[in-house]
Amino acid sequence: RVLFRSGCRVARAEKSPHAEKLFQWLERGWHAGMEWMARSPERRTDPAEVLPGCRSVICLSYDYDSPGRRPEREGSICLYAHGKDYHGILEEKLADLQELLSIYGGKQKGYVDSGPVMERDHAEACGLGWRGKSGLIVRRKGGSRFFIATLLTTLELEPDAPVANGCGSCRRCAALCPTGAIMGNGQVDAGRCLSYWTIEHRGAIPEEIRPLIGTRLYGCDTCVMVCPWNGKPLPDVDERFRMSRL
């Protein structure tokens, strides 16, 4: 675990306890134009459907840089996108981990925000953090400013325990969301989310959404910026994920 500077924890490979919530989210159309989310949702909620014989899910977290104030007149880009593309970097970390595990045999399959894996469910189960009202995984040290990578394995590993939810009665993310996209129960209506419209959506942005975008160019980050757990700088951020002035 010392190889992974932000966090490395293990969850049991179990069916998602939030499977029914996912199905309801899809039925409500809250996935907007992300049609891949609606493909084989049952497979997405069960690691054994992705990797037969899966017994454990290893979750890696990797911090990205702290929020910085920017003049309102400047176009804003979400915090995580200021550094290098995290996919390739975390895939290298997964490859290192797979090489270590190969000593013990078994089969492994890794994903970085790209496969039919409910990584936030696994991250919550193993105590990487708790699920905030915004749907993001939040930690007491570092808030929600981190990427998640998952490695499914057929090896039986000792699981870590979940942590207590630290949101309490706070609803800042939901109350200050510029479009009311945060439902406050850990779910987001992507059809209202500015990150969806400025990152995931392909095509023209609806006229009723355009005035709400303001100076945002890519992403939103309001829910990240207003979260009390994100107030302190992160001391040990990989230089590749440091913010730079574009």
Each PLM stretch: what is its role?
Residues 245-246:
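Glycine-rich phosphate/pyrophosphate-binding loop
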Residues 7, 172-196, 202, 213-240:
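Iron-sulfur cluster-binding cysteine motifs and their immediate structural context
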Residues 1-166, 205, 214-215:
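Auxiliary alpha/beta "docking" domains used to position bulky ligands
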